[in-house]
Regions:
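Second RecA-like catalytic domain
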Residues: 1-171
Length: 171
């Protein structure tokens, strides 16, 4: 299952978009930043009617239709969980629970910081945190990434700080 990122960054308004999106950033995790965005959207969705919600999305450089796709996928996954008699969390997952759940699917996408400040990943691949990441300047000792993209360098996009002790039990 794949859904496009609802955040928009038009070339002529990149700085304004980055400022609008900054309200959801998390200093340790781009994944948590997406959760923050989801919660912000849900809060607005419950408070506003359709037209003001679309305006809120436009003002915050968010694609309304992609957010509806997020919502539809969430609803479908919730129904599947109910059909399988899986219980949903009563409380939102904390940082370790959220990231361990994601890490299970990204075990080949972890990296350890080197003395040079880049990261060494699987198969001795060296990569850097993409400048768009919310954790770029923090440079955690260990991280996981959802995506490695080659431009001028090999960059990790959508990254999160992880605890090295989480890796072995999940492998």
């Amino acid at each position: 299952m794949s859904i496009q990122d609802p955040r928009e960054r038009p070339p002529e308004r990149q700085q304004a978009a980055d400022q609008a999106h900054a309200q959801w950033k998390d200093a340790d995790s781009d994944f948590a930043g997406l959760v923050n965005l989801w919660r912000g959207f849900e809060e607005q969705r419950q408070a506003l009617t359709a037209s003001p919600l679309r305006n809120w999305c436009r003002k915050n450089f968010l694609n309304y239709l992609r957010l509806r796709e997020w919502r539809d996928s969430h609803r479908q996954l919730s129904l599947i969980c109910r059909d399988l008699q899986l219980s949903l969390n009563k409380e939102p997952a904390d940082y370790p629970k959220l990231h361990k759940a994601v890490l299970v699917g990204l075990l080949s996408q972890i990296g350890q910081k080197t003395e040079d400040g880049d990261y060494l990943g699987a198969r001795q691949r060296r990569f850097w945190i993409h400048p768009s990441s919310g954790i770029g300047k923090k440079r955690p000792q260990w991280l996981m990434t959802a995506e490695l993209v080659e431009t001028t360098k090999l960059y990790a996009r959508m990254v999160a700080k992880i605890d090295a002790d989480w890796i072995e039990p999940l492998a």
